[in-house]
Structures are given as C-alpha cells and as structure tokens.
Amino acid sequence: MQVKENKQLCLISLGCSKNLVDSEVMLGKLYNYTLTNDAKKADVILINTCGFIESAKQESIQTILNAAKDKKEGAILIASGCLSERYKDEIKELIPEVDIFTGVGDYDKIDILIAKKQNQFSEQVFLSEHYNARIITGSSVHAYVKISEGCNQKCSFCAIPSFKGKLQSRELDSILKEVEDLALKGYKDMTFIAQDSSSFLYDKGQKDGLIQLIRAIDKQQALKSARILYLYPSSTTLELIGAIEDSPIFQNYFDMPIQHISDSMLKKMRRNSSQAHHLKLLNAMKQVKESFIRSTIIVGHPEENESEFEELSAFLDEFRFDRLNIFAFSAEENTHAYSLEKVPKKIINARIKALNKIALKHQNHSFKALLNKPIKALVEHKEGEYFYKARDLRWAPEVDGEILINDSELTTPLKPGHYTIVPSAFKDNILLAKVLSPF
C-alpha cells in the first residue's frame, strides 16, 4: 500500500507531449506527494521546461519566475528539462531563485535530487522504459508512448540534437510491454511519439523499425486505436504509409512536418529531402481512405525570398492540409542558420498572416466534412457541467480539435471510451455531436 506524505506537489509540464511523458515519469517517482494546481500551497514546485525555440524559452523562464514569487517559505522550486539542459552552464546564475536544476538525463532520479536538494546533469539522455512507473495525466483512456529519444537529422534551424543528443531507440519488446501494461489499466488509445518517429531503430541498423512496431502492435491486439506523430520526410516511405493504411489499430493519421516545399529552401534548411519526395509521400497519404494529414511550416528562414514563399503559399492552398502549424523562424544558438542574414520581422509577420488565412480555410473545411455522418471517436471525460469531451479517433489529443456531446440528450452517463458519434454542428474549432453507440 502506497502511503501519501503530508506534502503537496505542483507539477507544471511545458512544451510537447514528449516532455509530458518525462513529467509523468517524475510523477511516478513522487507518487507519495499530494498533487495541487496551486503553487502557493505546494511544498515542491516542479517545472519541466521547454527550450526548443525563443517563445518556448521565454514561457519557461516566465513560468519559473512566477513560481518563485508564489512559493511559500521552505518550499523547493525545481527546473528540469530542456531549458535547464540547454543552458546548464549559465542558468544557475541567471535564475538564482531556483533551488534545484536538472536536465534531460535524470527524470527517474527526481525523488533522490529532492531528498538531497542537489543539482544534477547526467550525460546520458533519459529514455523512458516499460519499468519506469508513470502516472498518466489528463485521461483515463489515452496515453502517450515515447519510442525513441534524440535525433540524427541536421536541420539548419533546429537545436534539439545539441541538448537531446543522437537518436536512441527503445527495444521493441520494451515498448510492447509498456503498451500491454497500460492497456490492462484501461488505456486503449495511444499516441506514439519521438523527435523523429520514422527513424525508429535506424540507430540499431534497421530501416523498417516503425513498420515492425505497427505490425507488432496489430498482432498484440491490446489496443483499440493508435496514431503516430512526427514523421520525418527523408525516413518516411511508401511502405510505411501502406503499413499504417493496412493496420486495424493505427488510424490513417499522417503528421509529417515538411517545413517548406521549395527545393531551394529545403536545401537551405538542410532537410535532406526534396519537393518531389514530399509530393510523392503527401499524395500517397491523400490517397489513403479517410486520411487526416497534418504538417508544420517554418516561415522566414534566412534567405527565404518572395518567389520561394509564393511557391509555398500556392502549394499549401492547393494541397489542403487538414491541420497546419505555422511557425516564424527562431534563430537558435548552435545551429547553422543562427548566423545567417535574417528575413525582416515585418516580412515574416505578413507571410505568416497570409498562410494562416489559407490554413484556417482548409481547417474549417476539414471540420465541416465530418458533419452529419457517423465517425469513430474517443470520449475522454466530462467537460464542465453539461458536456462530454471527445475527439475523432484520427486526431491527436489537444491539437487537432475537440468534439462536445451534450449530456442532456443521453439516457445514461457516458463512460470514457470508444463510440460511434454523429457531429451535427460546428463553430470555433468545436464540433457538437450525438452518440450512436459504443464499439
């Protein structure tokens, strides 16, 4: 029997879903604390930071400073994760309000660091395994599973390899064991994540690692549904797309950040890919029945000229992505693009505004295409007093939209899980739907 300490923990997990998995590992080590969302009441405030781009760094720093103001006398303030790792040599002096700093190598030792009240930065990047106890947050039916850590790509704009290191993939058996354990606890929907998911097992000399994973999950039959985030174009193949299409468990969800479509820009970005390869993959994805395609674009990378931008803009309007993330270029230390001549901010902002207009048009069309037809969905939890929150099974949590189901139209309360529903109305990125039946 686990006995709770009479101490409260406030955990703030910033950044991506990969960071969230590491935060959940830390929660697993700190299971004997009572969780609170109020930093002023906490005995320990733990902030798992993001250090990806400038806006994320600023958010992390501001969150730390706010927590420092809120913390009560005697409380411990901890900054872990990417920001701490990336700036470990100077961060202790820059933010003296923090009691403990730790990076990306010691999530599974957080209880020891708190007990000893010491900083620690291990050289080896931590990669969660099946034996690392996690406390899953946010859902009783969905969990993220991290399949690898680090990245071997050499994109001109990305600093991640400088603090996350080279690609290190988990053993397939470890992933299957984690999936089985989580499924037995009721997590029947999972999202598989990594910095570069399509390169899974490349570091172990296997080029079809992600296909192996898909087929092993299908054979295992522990899950009802799953999807994969963060495919990298140069390591994505037609065979991989086919494996996803053929899977009874993995949804026809394709999240592949292309960053640009112009060949000259892809070369400047050091993406190790080409427009022809992008189009081959994207058109194959679009041919898959009921496919859902998400991508990411960087606007204003150094040396992006008007012609290259117009080529990108025309392509995005023609291809019609279901969802599109558009980022302004962020100059990051220890990257090739950091010292290159910058595109003026005024031009970047104008370009982003134009692309956002295109993205919103096609996003709304994607939502409306679901109206008045049965779709498979995951009901996650009650949202407020009158609604249940759900999402299309193809969608990733949090980022692709939400569906609300009015409980006044139900004869019995809904349990979290898989249902067939019919969306009937759409407004402000939200679909309203009725439940037909569970499946």
Curated annotation (Swiss-Prot):
Q: Where does [4Fe-4S] cluster 2 bind?
A: 151, 155, 158
Question: Mind telling me which GO cellular component terms the entry cites?
Answer: cytosol
Stretches assigned to the MTTase N-terminal domain: 7-119
Q: Does the keyword Iron apply?
A: yes
This protein's record includes keyword Iron: yes
Q: What class of enzyme is it?
A: transferase
Which Pfam family, any one of them, does this sequence belong to?
Answer: Radical_SAM
Which keywords are on file for this protein?
4Fe-4S, Cytoplasm, Iron, Iron-sulfur, Metal-binding, S-adenosyl-L-methionine, Transferase
- What is the protein name for this chain? Ribosomal protein uS12 methylthiotransferase RimO
Q: Look up and give the organism this protein is from.
A: Helicobacter pylori (strain J99 / ATCC 700824) (Campylobacter pylori J99)
What gene is this protein a product of? rimO
